[in-house]
């Protein structure tokens, strides 16, 4: 059974959750304003797009499998960003409280 955005924001340390399309259109969000969700989705879409380009290039040059992308994680300052489902579903979390492994697994559902 897929984990809902409500379930995600109820996980320890998770502040907000969101989903978006490859072009950065925010399709759903929890615990954040519409305006902030739109900005988050646009920025995360850009990062996902960059990782997709890097992975394609690495695959071609190294003849190793780097695609398809499953997701990415950023940790900086006191916050963590975790994206899964190809980099189109994610959460922002408090780094000191979140279990990256647990949230990553829940996002992959």
Enumerate the predicted regions with their spans.
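Non-catalytic interaction/Regulatory regions outside core domains
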Residues: 1-109
